[in-house]
Design a protein with these regions (language model features):
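Alpha/beta-hydrolase fold catalytic core
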Residues: 1-54, 79-80, 119-120, 311-313
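Conserved alpha/beta-hydrolase catalytic His-Asp/Glu region
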Residues: 23, 160-165, 185-251
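Active-site loop/oxyanion-hole signature of alpha/beta-hydrolase fold enzymes
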Residues: 36-40, 46-50, 87-125, 129, ...
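Conserved HGGG/HGGXW glycine-rich cap/lid loop of the alpha/beta-hydrolase fold
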Residues: 48-92
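Flexible "cap/lid" loop of the alpha/beta hydrolase fold
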Residues: 139, 149-185
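Short beta-strand/loop motif that positions the catalytic acidic residue
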Residues: 252, 258-260
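Acidic catalytic loop of the alpha/beta-hydrolase fold
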Residues: 263-267
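Catalytic active-site module of serine/aspartate enzymes centered on a nucleophile-bearing elbow/loop
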Residues: 282-313
Length: 313
Protein backbone atom coordinates (compact mmCIF):
# COMPACT_ATOMS: atom_id res chain seq x y z
CA UNK A 1 0.00 0.00 0.00
CA UNK A 2 2.82 2.42 0.89
CA UNK A 3 4.49 1.80 -2.47
CA UNK A 4 1.21 2.56 -4.27
CA UNK A 5 0.82 5.82 -2.34
CA UNK A 6 4.41 6.84 -3.09
CA UNK A 7 3.90 6.19 -6.80
CA UNK A 8 0.62 8.12 -6.78
CA UNK A 9 2.23 11.08 -5.02
CA UNK A 10 5.13 11.08 -7.46
CA UNK A 11 2.78 11.14 -10.46
CA UNK A 12 0.33 13.71 -9.06
CA UNK A 13 2.99 16.14 -7.81
CA UNK A 14 5.65 15.49 -10.47
CA UNK A 15 7.51 18.50 -11.81
CA UNK A 16 10.49 18.30 -14.16
CA UNK A 17 13.77 20.16 -13.76
CA UNK A 18 14.34 23.59 -15.28
CA UNK A 19 17.17 23.94 -17.84
CA UNK A 20 20.38 25.05 -16.13
CA UNK A 21 21.12 27.66 -18.79
CA UNK A 22 17.76 29.32 -18.22
CA UNK A 23 18.25 29.50 -14.45
CA UNK A 24 21.87 30.61 -14.78
CA UNK A 25 20.92 33.47 -17.09
CA UNK A 26 18.36 34.76 -14.60
CA UNK A 27 20.41 34.47 -11.41
CA UNK A 28 23.93 35.36 -12.55
CA UNK A 29 25.08 38.92 -13.05
CA UNK A 30 28.15 40.93 -14.08
CA UNK A 31 29.86 39.99 -10.80
CA UNK A 32 29.31 36.25 -11.28
CA UNK A 33 32.39 34.15 -11.94
CA UNK A 34 32.85 30.41 -12.34
CA UNK A 35 35.82 28.20 -11.56
CA UNK A 36 36.34 24.57 -12.49
CA UNK A 37 37.72 22.48 -9.63
CA UNK A 38 40.00 19.50 -10.15
CA UNK A 39 37.02 17.19 -9.52
CA UNK A 40 35.12 18.83 -12.39
CA UNK A 41 32.75 20.89 -10.25
CA UNK A 42 31.83 24.27 -11.73
CA UNK A 43 31.59 26.67 -8.78
CA UNK A 44 29.73 29.97 -8.92
CA UNK A 45 31.23 32.80 -6.86
CA UNK A 46 31.36 36.59 -6.66
CA UNK A 47 34.28 38.80 -5.62
CA UNK A 48 32.90 42.24 -4.71
CA UNK A 49 33.57 45.31 -2.59
CA UNK A 50 36.89 47.04 -2.02
CA UNK A 51 39.67 45.28 -3.91
CA UNK A 52 42.31 46.21 -1.32
CA UNK A 53 40.08 45.73 1.71
CA UNK A 54 40.19 43.01 4.33
CA UNK A 55 38.87 39.85 2.62
CA UNK A 56 35.67 38.36 4.04
CA UNK A 57 34.38 35.05 2.65
CA UNK A 58 30.70 34.29 3.33
CA UNK A 59 29.00 30.88 3.02
CA UNK A 60 25.22 30.41 2.68
CA UNK A 61 22.95 27.91 4.42
CA UNK A 62 20.99 24.85 3.27
CA UNK A 63 18.72 25.35 0.24
CA UNK A 64 20.07 28.90 -0.11
CA UNK A 65 22.67 30.51 -2.38
CA UNK A 66 25.18 33.34 -2.40
CA UNK A 67 22.27 35.71 -3.07
CA UNK A 68 21.43 35.55 0.64
CA UNK A 69 24.52 37.70 1.32
CA UNK A 70 23.80 40.50 -1.14
CA UNK A 71 22.32 42.82 1.52
CA UNK A 72 25.54 42.46 3.54
CA UNK A 73 27.71 42.78 0.42
CA UNK A 74 26.14 46.18 -0.24
CA UNK A 75 27.06 47.35 3.27
CA UNK A 76 30.31 45.51 4.04
CA UNK A 77 31.56 46.06 0.50
CA UNK A 78 31.95 49.76 1.21
CA UNK A 79 34.96 48.89 3.41
CA UNK A 80 35.89 45.28 2.77
CA UNK A 81 36.46 42.81 -0.04
CA UNK A 82 33.55 40.35 0.12
CA UNK A 83 33.68 36.94 -1.56
CA UNK A 84 30.54 34.79 -1.71
CA UNK A 85 30.06 31.36 -3.27
CA UNK A 86 27.51 28.68 -4.07
CA UNK A 87 28.29 25.36 -2.39
CA UNK A 88 27.78 22.04 -4.22
CA UNK A 89 24.06 21.15 -4.51
CA UNK A 90 23.16 24.84 -4.25
CA UNK A 91 22.70 27.93 -6.37
CA UNK A 92 24.41 28.01 -9.75
CA UNK A 93 27.00 25.45 -8.65
CA UNK A 94 24.31 22.79 -8.32
CA UNK A 95 25.07 19.16 -9.04
CA UNK A 96 28.74 18.19 -9.37
CA UNK A 97 30.27 15.30 -11.37
CA UNK A 98 31.73 13.59 -8.30
CA UNK A 99 28.37 13.41 -6.53
CA UNK A 100 30.12 14.48 -3.32
CA UNK A 101 28.03 16.80 -1.15
CA UNK A 102 29.31 16.22 2.37
CA UNK A 103 31.28 18.40 4.76
CA UNK A 104 34.61 17.61 3.11
CA UNK A 105 33.28 18.68 -0.29
CA UNK A 106 32.23 22.00 1.24
CA UNK A 107 35.68 22.48 2.78
CA UNK A 108 37.33 21.76 -0.57
CA UNK A 109 35.01 24.20 -2.35
CA UNK A 110 35.75 27.05 0.07
CA UNK A 111 39.47 26.32 -0.28
CA UNK A 112 39.26 26.31 -4.08
CA UNK A 113 37.50 29.68 -4.18
CA UNK A 114 39.96 31.22 -1.71
CA UNK A 115 42.85 29.98 -3.85
CA UNK A 116 41.20 31.17 -7.07
CA UNK A 117 40.86 34.74 -5.81
CA UNK A 118 44.38 34.74 -4.35
CA UNK A 119 43.68 34.76 -0.62
CA UNK A 120 46.29 33.57 1.86
CA UNK A 121 44.27 34.50 4.95
CA UNK A 122 40.73 35.78 5.36
CA UNK A 123 37.76 36.24 7.65
CA UNK A 124 35.30 33.37 7.15
CA UNK A 125 31.63 33.54 7.98
CA UNK A 126 28.53 31.49 7.39
CA UNK A 127 24.83 31.16 8.11
CA UNK A 128 23.21 27.92 9.28
CA UNK A 129 24.82 25.07 7.31
CA UNK A 130 27.36 27.62 6.08
CA UNK A 131 28.26 28.32 9.70
CA UNK A 132 29.00 24.63 10.11
CA UNK A 133 31.12 24.76 6.97
CA UNK A 134 32.93 27.76 8.51
CA UNK A 135 34.05 26.15 11.75
CA UNK A 136 34.85 22.87 9.99
CA UNK A 137 37.05 24.73 7.48
CA UNK A 138 38.77 26.56 10.34
CA UNK A 139 39.50 23.25 12.06
CA UNK A 140 41.20 21.95 8.90
CA UNK A 141 42.89 25.21 7.85
CA UNK A 142 43.36 27.24 11.04
CA UNK A 143 46.30 29.16 9.59
CA UNK A 144 44.12 30.67 6.85
CA UNK A 145 41.18 31.86 8.96
CA UNK A 146 41.90 35.10 10.83
CA UNK A 147 38.41 35.41 12.34
CA UNK A 148 34.98 33.78 12.12
CA UNK A 149 31.42 35.09 11.90
CA UNK A 150 28.82 32.44 12.81
CA UNK A 151 25.24 33.45 11.99
CA UNK A 152 22.63 31.06 13.46
CA UNK A 153 25.22 28.37 12.75
CA UNK A 154 24.75 24.64 12.59
CA UNK A 155 26.38 23.26 15.76
CA UNK A 156 28.38 20.04 15.97
CA UNK A 157 26.07 17.04 15.59
CA UNK A 158 26.93 15.88 19.10
CA UNK A 159 25.35 19.07 20.51
CA UNK A 160 22.05 18.81 18.72
CA UNK A 161 20.25 16.72 21.29
CA UNK A 162 21.15 19.32 23.90
CA UNK A 163 20.28 22.41 21.85
CA UNK A 164 17.06 21.37 20.13
CA UNK A 165 13.71 22.05 21.71
CA UNK A 166 10.38 20.56 20.69
CA UNK A 167 8.69 23.89 19.97
CA UNK A 168 11.31 24.98 17.43
CA UNK A 169 11.12 21.58 15.75
CA UNK A 170 7.34 21.92 15.38
CA UNK A 171 7.36 25.45 14.00
CA UNK A 172 10.37 25.21 11.67
CA UNK A 173 10.48 24.44 7.95
CA UNK A 174 8.58 21.21 7.25
CA UNK A 175 10.98 20.30 4.42
CA UNK A 176 13.88 19.78 6.83
CA UNK A 177 11.83 17.31 8.87
CA UNK A 178 10.61 15.48 5.76
CA UNK A 179 14.12 15.16 4.31
CA UNK A 180 15.09 13.13 7.38
CA UNK A 181 12.48 10.54 6.38
CA UNK A 182 13.54 7.77 4.02
CA UNK A 183 10.08 7.46 2.43
CA UNK A 184 10.10 11.15 1.51
CA UNK A 185 13.62 11.08 0.09
CA UNK A 186 12.47 8.19 -2.14
CA UNK A 187 10.09 10.50 -4.03
CA UNK A 188 11.45 13.99 -3.34
CA UNK A 189 13.60 14.08 -6.46
CA UNK A 190 10.49 14.24 -8.64
CA UNK A 191 8.13 16.31 -6.48
CA UNK A 192 7.20 19.94 -7.02
CA UNK A 193 8.62 21.60 -3.88
CA UNK A 194 6.62 24.84 -4.20
CA UNK A 195 4.35 24.35 -1.14
CA UNK A 196 7.28 23.34 1.06
CA UNK A 197 9.41 26.27 -0.09
CA UNK A 198 6.76 28.84 0.78
CA UNK A 199 6.17 27.39 4.25
CA UNK A 200 9.87 26.90 4.87
CA UNK A 201 10.82 30.46 3.98
CA UNK A 202 8.09 31.99 6.13
CA UNK A 203 9.28 29.89 9.07
CA UNK A 204 12.99 30.48 8.54
CA UNK A 205 12.60 34.23 7.99
CA UNK A 206 10.28 34.60 11.01
CA UNK A 207 7.42 35.81 8.77
CA UNK A 208 9.56 38.75 7.70
CA UNK A 209 8.28 41.06 4.93
CA UNK A 210 11.50 40.32 3.04
CA UNK A 211 9.86 37.03 1.96
CA UNK A 212 8.56 38.46 -1.29
CA UNK A 213 7.30 36.67 -4.37
CA UNK A 214 10.67 37.31 -6.01
CA UNK A 215 12.54 35.68 -3.11
CA UNK A 216 10.25 32.63 -3.17
CA UNK A 217 10.70 32.36 -6.93
CA UNK A 218 14.48 32.51 -6.56
CA UNK A 219 14.58 29.66 -4.05
CA UNK A 220 12.16 27.63 -6.15
CA UNK A 221 13.93 28.09 -9.46
CA UNK A 222 17.40 27.45 -8.05
CA UNK A 223 16.16 24.23 -6.45
CA UNK A 224 14.46 23.24 -9.72
CA UNK A 225 17.68 23.82 -11.70
CA UNK A 226 18.63 20.67 -13.62
CA UNK A 227 20.09 18.10 -11.22
CA UNK A 228 19.83 20.15 -8.04
CA UNK A 229 16.99 18.23 -6.38
CA UNK A 230 18.93 14.99 -6.76
CA UNK A 231 22.03 16.74 -5.43
CA UNK A 232 20.11 18.01 -2.39
CA UNK A 233 19.11 14.43 -1.63
CA UNK A 234 22.77 13.44 -1.96
CA UNK A 235 23.71 16.17 0.49
CA UNK A 236 21.03 15.02 2.93
CA UNK A 237 22.32 11.45 2.75
CA UNK A 238 25.90 12.66 3.27
CA UNK A 239 24.94 14.51 6.43
CA UNK A 240 22.79 11.63 7.69
CA UNK A 241 25.87 9.41 7.52
CA UNK A 242 28.29 12.02 8.87
CA UNK A 243 30.68 11.36 11.73
CA UNK A 244 29.07 12.52 14.97
CA UNK A 245 32.22 12.58 17.11
CA UNK A 246 32.70 15.69 19.21
CA UNK A 247 35.03 18.24 17.57
CA UNK A 248 37.26 20.25 19.86
CA UNK A 249 36.27 23.82 19.06
CA UNK A 250 38.49 25.13 21.85
CA UNK A 251 41.44 24.96 19.44
CA UNK A 252 39.79 27.70 17.35
CA UNK A 253 41.39 30.69 19.02
CA UNK A 254 40.49 33.13 16.25
CA UNK A 255 38.24 36.04 17.26
CA UNK A 256 34.68 34.88 16.60
CA UNK A 257 31.44 36.81 16.32
CA UNK A 258 28.30 34.75 17.00
CA UNK A 259 25.08 36.35 15.75
CA UNK A 260 21.69 34.79 16.48
CA UNK A 261 18.03 35.55 16.01
CA UNK A 262 16.15 34.67 19.18
CA UNK A 263 13.10 33.73 17.07
CA UNK A 264 15.06 31.12 15.10
CA UNK A 265 12.73 28.19 14.38
CA UNK A 266 15.47 26.05 12.79
CA UNK A 267 18.32 26.13 15.33
CA UNK A 268 17.28 27.39 18.77
CA UNK A 269 19.07 30.32 20.35
CA UNK A 270 20.39 28.03 23.09
CA UNK A 271 23.01 26.89 20.55
CA UNK A 272 24.53 30.38 20.70
CA UNK A 273 25.32 29.87 24.37
CA UNK A 274 26.88 26.50 23.55
CA UNK A 275 29.19 28.16 21.00
CA UNK A 276 30.01 30.84 23.57
CA UNK A 277 31.09 28.13 26.01
CA UNK A 278 33.06 26.09 23.46
CA UNK A 279 34.96 28.88 21.70
CA UNK A 280 37.72 30.65 23.66
CA UNK A 281 37.61 34.06 21.94
CA UNK A 282 33.99 34.84 21.21
CA UNK A 283 31.57 37.75 21.20
CA UNK A 284 27.85 36.97 21.02
CA UNK A 285 25.04 39.23 19.80
CA UNK A 286 21.39 38.13 20.08
CA UNK A 287 18.63 39.92 18.15
CA UNK A 288 15.39 39.32 20.03
CA UNK A 289 13.10 40.04 17.08
CA UNK A 290 14.90 38.16 14.28
CA UNK A 291 14.80 34.58 13.03
CA UNK A 292 17.12 32.16 11.24
CA UNK A 293 18.22 34.52 8.43
CA UNK A 294 19.04 37.73 10.34
CA UNK A 295 21.39 39.13 7.69
CA UNK A 296 18.43 39.41 5.30
CA UNK A 297 15.74 40.16 7.86
CA UNK A 298 17.62 43.25 9.10
CA UNK A 299 20.82 43.86 7.10
CA UNK A 300 21.63 47.24 8.63
CA UNK A 301 21.58 46.19 12.29
CA UNK A 302 23.33 42.88 11.75
CA UNK A 303 25.99 44.24 9.40
CA UNK A 304 26.73 47.04 11.88
CA UNK A 305 27.74 44.37 14.41
CA UNK A 306 30.01 42.76 11.83
CA UNK A 307 31.66 46.09 11.00
CA UNK A 308 32.25 46.77 14.70
CA UNK A 309 33.77 43.30 15.07
CA UNK A 310 36.02 43.63 12.03
CA UNK A 311 37.21 47.10 13.03
CA UNK A 312 38.52 45.63 16.29
CA UNK A 313 40.65 42.96 14.60
Amino acid sequence: MLIVLLIAASVFLFEGDMPAAQVDAKYSNAESKFLIMENGARVHYRDQGQEGGMPVVLVHGAMASLHTWEPWVEILGQRYRVITLDLPAHGLTGAVPSGEYGAEAFTQTIDAVANEVGLDTFVLGGNSMGGGATWRYALEHPQRVTAMVLVDSVPPASWQGESEDSESRRSGPVAFSLLRQGWFRAIAGALDPAPLIGQGLRAAYNDSPVVTEALVDRYYELIMRDGTRAAILGRTDSYSNADTKMPDLSVLTQPTLVIWGAQDSVIPVSAAAAFETALPNVRTVIFDDLGHIPMEEDPQRTAAEVVSFLEAL
